[in-house]
Amino acid sequence: RVADEPVLHERTGALLEPTTPVVIGVGQVVRRTPDLDAPVEPVASAVEALRAAERDAGVEVLGRADLVYAVPSASWTYPDQAGLVASLVGAEEAGTVQTSAYGGDGGQLAMNDAADRIVSGDAHVVLVSGAEAGATVAALQVQGREPEWTRQPDDAAPDRVIGVDRPANNEAETSVGLGAPIYVYALIESALRGAAGTDEAEHRAAIADLWARHSAVAAANPYAWDPTARTAE
């Protein structure tokens, strides 16, 4: 229930407006070793994570969602992933929102839009979801198999799509093989180094230090894909 008056935040003593966005539950799922006898599709992992978030919240909220967001999977395409998630968690009446397929900022876009909808009073309970199964798809491809996962009608669509919905690469990039992000990132790093005026050794050391700190964060999260702390060396 949404309060009628500002709510006291006990730890800080601050008064919060009733429409202040609050994250009440978080859930994560990781499958480092694919089960090729019963391959789990992305939307199933997304639902599993949402159920974990509901347990984390300590209150049943999934079926009460006003909006369901989905960051679309790159490993298996669902035209309306948000709608599929909504139906699987019992929120069939919820509005559905999906971020655009490319950009890498889908998670943050979804959180920003969800917060805006809560502040405006358009929604009170919002679910934000996303999942991948790239390792499973790759392992199946090695065996010459294709996943037998959910296929929606081509005309299935969420209520809204947010983000820039355009091809990931233009013709010039594609013509010289700049398709995968790993190639483009290398060019960006070279441009950053040039702009900063540092030499290769300095820039390499800075990147190594950054990723060493990233790995320390991952090592503290049992749901990280590679929870191994690594040094800059």
Predicted regions and their residues:
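Conserved "HGTGT" condensation-loop signature of ketosynthase/thiolase-family condensing enzymes
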Residues: 1-100, 116-123, 127-233
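Conserved phosphate-binding catalytic cores of ATP/NTP-utilizing and phosphoryl-transfer enzymes
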Residues: 107-116
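Short helix-initiation/N-cap motifs at beta->coil->alpha
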Residues: 103-104
